[in-house]
Amino acid sequence: ILKLCSDPEGKPSKRKGMVVGNVQSGKTANYLGLITKAADAGYKVIIIVAGMLEELRKQTQIRLEESFVGVNAIDNKSVGVGKFSRRSDDKIPFCVTNRDSDFRKQKTTDTSNLSNITASAPYVIVVKKNLSVLNNLNNWLDSIRKNNDQDIVNKSMLLIDDEADNASIDLKSRVKNKKPQKPLTEGQEKQKDEMDYPEEHWSNYDATRINASLRRILKKFNISTYVGYTATP
């Protein structure tokens, strides 16, 4: 999977992909492994969109701390892999969120964070798939971009979308699907697809708000990879 992602230390690029696995087949463990490899490869910002519920987000945050970060983001005590080999503090990934706190609005005023990323310690963020939370995250990234007088955040970013089929890819129709009430004439027959099958014409659709929010996050980085995980594509 990592080989298909954007090169975090290469030229500006954007890649998108999907991983499909059966229910309870280890998808979370798979993307935690991908995150670890991505950090080794040089990714500087790692965002996990962990479902719609806070309980799911909390569970994902805990597993991330135990499997990758090595410390509890609240009290900085060693957990999981951190009990076997504790990194020096400057190499511990920085958690913007913790098991008790999603990405909140007050974080948007702190524009110092991303400018202090070291050569070896990425920033990790675990958020709910919630419009308000995603807006807060987008506003924070905008503040960092403007504070550094940049059109785009000059860092490599990996976005993991858990349960990617839920809301992330939703579209809304710009036009009503009006089926003809009378038999079509020869000229009208040519337009049948547009009238009856608007799903085949992407220009007739707009992204829903969550879909658009995820797109906004991806556009803010010069190097980004989106990987959606799902059991029901």
List the model feature ranges, each with a label.
Residues 1-233:
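RecA-like P-loop NTPase motor core of helicase/translocase proteins
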